[in-house]
């Protein structure tokens, strides 16, 4: 699995929650770019954001501004929805992390289903545009092997199960 270790990132900062606050306030405060700049000044060597299909937090203008103004690589998390992938190919972030998306989820609750129809085509399309591809996957040897076969540049492991284990072990379930 050495092939996944090509780039070393020390601090990647997800700035989505800046947009969550902005949308809750229904004004342009806090400003997404000011948050991005603060993260970079603080040492971030990657900025991550998630363009959801429903645009509930981050929107297309945010992504354009982030890509155009960031001096560090931008990782854009997204679904494999065709409209979203068209946008990603047009604005070409450094990396696209493909994630599952269900509108009813508050946050992503699991990894991408690697047998999803069209996934390999999306990966190839992004790579042909010069965009590095990452997959957000559940932690299993099988998923890691499949990701390797798909020749993605890196993977991100969903660790929700591990994060929630204490509550599961100490609940009355």
Model-inferred region functions:
Residues 4-77, 81-93, 146-149, 167-172:
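Conserved N-terminal beta1-alpha1 strand-loop-helix module at the mouth
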Residues 79-114:
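Active-site beta->alpha loop and helix N-cap motifs at the rims of alpha/beta catalytic domains
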Residues 46-51, 97-98, 133-137, 155-158:
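Short beta-strand segments at enzyme active-site cores
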Residues 8-24, 102, 106-109, 120, ...:
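N-terminal small/glycine-rich loop or linker at the start of catalytic domains
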Residues 134-173:
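Histidine/lysine/aspartate-rich catalytic loop segments that bind and position anionic ligands
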Residues 42-45, 121-133:
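A structural motif corresponding to the C-terminal end of an alpha-helix
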């Amino acid at each position: 699995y050495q092939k996944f270790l090509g780039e070393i990132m020390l601090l990647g900062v997800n700035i989505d929650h800046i947009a969550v606050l902005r949308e809750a306030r229904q004004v342009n405060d806090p400003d997404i770019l000011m948050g991005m700049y603060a993260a970079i000044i603080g040492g971030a060597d990657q900025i991550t954001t998630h363009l959801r299909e429903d645009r509930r937090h981050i929107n297309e203008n945010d992504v354009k501004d982030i890509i155009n103004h960031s001096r560090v690589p931008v990782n854009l998390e997204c679904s494999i929805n065709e409209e979203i992938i068209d946008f990603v190919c047009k604005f070409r972030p450094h990396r696209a992390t493909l994630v599952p998306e269900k509108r009813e989820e508050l946050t992503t609750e699991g990894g991408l289903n690697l047998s999803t129809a069209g996934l390999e085509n999306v990966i190839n399309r992004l790579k042909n545009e010069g965009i590095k591809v990452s997959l957000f996957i559940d932690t299993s040897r099988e998923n890691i092997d499949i990701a390797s076969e798909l020749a993605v540049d890196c993977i991100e492991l969903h660790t929700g199960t591990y994060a929630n284990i204490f509550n599961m072990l100490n609940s009355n379930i």
